[in-house]
């Protein structure tokens, strides 16, 4: 599956907010002007962005945060629409329940991209079994662990140390000594961080 391999700061500037694509040890510097669009002098437009433009921009932002491509994102939205409850909130819950995101939230990867790589390289166990599919939906009670042969990777220890300095999410529990964690529950909307206006995405797909 194709992935964006270009500068992460460029994407953050395009969306005007930190997309958390870079780890805390290499966070966006002060030189990255989030209020200036990419381009030699920052692209400007004399006209106000349309409602459609804002909706499209929000969808692009969420896709980039979670590292999901268009076709897969549409499938997530269709599934969210099929389920009972608030479609936008359910969409975010589906994205947050992806295995690569759970690995990231547990602190085993410093970014979602790094967490995805750990899964793809079979460094992760789900309920005791090795898995290599980042998009697997994790369920409440599932146990996610680092495989024995991967426990010596310095990047995992460094990532856990960084997470210890930040506010941990409440819907996962982590045993840093065992390098394993439990997905306690699907997060509520207020538990999901990030400047996301999911209602704009719902409006976009409702056109």
UniProtKB/Swiss-Prot annotation:
Q: Which family does it belong to?
A: Belongs to the universal ribosomal protein uS4 family.
- Quote any Pfam family the record assigns: S4
Any one cellular component term from GO for this entry?
Answer: small ribosomal subunit
Query: One GO molecular function term?
Result: rRNA binding
Q: Where is the composition biased (Polar residues)?
A: 42-53
According to its UniProt entry, one GO biological process term is: translation
Subunit: Part of the 30S ribosomal subunit. Contacts protein S5. The interaction surface between S4 and S5 is involved in control of translational fidelity.
Q: Which organism is the protein's source?
A: Polynucleobacter asymbioticus (strain DSM 18221 / CIP 109841 / QLW-P1DMWA-1)
Q: Which PANTHER family match?
A: 30S 40S RIBOSOMAL PROTEIN (PTHR11831), SMALL RIBOSOMAL SUBUNIT PROTEIN US4M (PTHR11831:SF4)
Q: Does the keyword Ribonucleoprotein apply?
A: yes
The organism's taxonomy opens as: Bacteria, Pseudomonadati, Pseudomonadota, Betaproteobacteria, Burkholderiales
Where does the secretion signal sit in this chain?
none
Q: Which PROSITE patterns match?
A: RIBOSOMAL_S4, S4
Q: Does the keyword NAD apply?
A: no
Give the superkingdom in one word.
Answer: Bacteria
**Protein function:** One of the primary rRNA binding proteins, it binds directly to 16S rRNA where it nucleates assembly of the body of the 30S subunit. With S5 and S12 plays an important role in translational accuracy.
Q: Cite the entry's keywords alphabetically.
A: Ribonucleoprotein, Ribosomal protein, RNA-binding, rRNA-binding
Question: According to the UniProt record, where is the region Disordered?
Answer: 31-54
Protein name per the record: Small ribosomal subunit protein uS4
């Amino acid at each position: 599956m194709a992935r964006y391999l270009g500068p992460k700061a460029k994407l953050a500037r395009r969306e005007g907010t930190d997309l958390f694509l870079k780890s805390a040890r290499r966070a966006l510097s002060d030189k990255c002007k989030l209020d200036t669009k990419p381009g030699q002098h920052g692209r400007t437009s004399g006209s106000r962005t349309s409602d459609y433009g804002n909706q499209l921009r929000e969808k692009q932002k969420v896709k980039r945060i979670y590292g999901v491509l268009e076709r897969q994102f549409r499938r997530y939205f269709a599934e969210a629409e099929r389920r009972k409850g608030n479609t936008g909130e359910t969409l975010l819950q589906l994205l947050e329940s992806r295995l690569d995101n759970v690995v990231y939230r547990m602190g085993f990867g410093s970014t979602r991209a790094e967490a995805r790589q750990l899964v793809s390289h079979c460094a992760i166990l789900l309920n005791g079994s090795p898995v290599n599919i980042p998009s697997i939906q994790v369920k409440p009670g599932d146990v996610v662990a680092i495989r024995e042969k991967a426990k010596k990777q310095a990047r995992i220890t460094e990532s856990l140390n960084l997470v210890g300095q930040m506010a941990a999410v409440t819907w996962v529990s982590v045993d840093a000594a065992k390098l394993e964690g439990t997905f306690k529950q699907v997060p509520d909307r207020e538990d999901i961080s990030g400047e996301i206006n999911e209602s704009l995405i719902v409006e976009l797909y409702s056109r």
